[in-house]
Regions:
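Acidic/His metal-coordination segments adjacent to aromatic residues that form catalytic metal sites
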Residues: 8-20, 84-94
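Amphipathic alpha-helix face/heptad-repeat signature
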Residues: 16-26, 30, 56
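Short alpha-helical hairpin
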Residues: 1-11, 33
C-alpha cells in the first residue's frame, strides 16, 4: 500500500502488520495441530479422521499463505520460526 493509500484509509501499517503476524502465527499453529493429529490418530475411524484433519490442515495452510503474502505486500516480514509463532499468536494452546 502506497503512502497516499495509507493516508486515505488512515492506516497505521505497523499495527496492521503486528495483527497480521499474530493471525499468521495462529494459522501456523492450527495447521500444525491438524497435521500432527492426522499422523498420530488411532482407532476404527482412523481413515475418516485422517482425511478430515488433512482437509483442515490444507485450509489453514492456505490461510497462512494469504496472510504471509499480505504481510510482504505491506512491506513487513512474516514471523519466521515456531518460537516466534508462540510469542505472537493470539490463541494459546496447552
Amino acid at each position: 500500500m502506497g503512502k497516499l493509500g495509507k493516508e486515505i484509509v488512515k492506516l497505521d501499517v505497523d499495527i496492521l502488520l503486528k495483527k497480521l503476524n499474530s493471525a499468521l502465527a495462529d494459522e501456523w499453529l492450527a495447521y500444525y495441530q491438524y497435521w500432527i493429529g492426522a499422523k498420530i490418530v488411532k482407532g476404527p475411524m482412523k481413515d475418516a479422521v485422517i482425511s478430515e484433519l488433512d482437509i483442515h490442515a490444507t485450509e489453514e495452510l492456505g490461510h497462512a499463505t494469504l496472510i504471509a503474502a499480505r504481510i510482504v505486500q505491506l512491506g513487513g516480514t512474516p514471523v519466521l520460526s515456531p518460537d516466534e509463532w508462540a510469542k505472537v499468536a493470539g490463541c494459546r494452546s496447552e
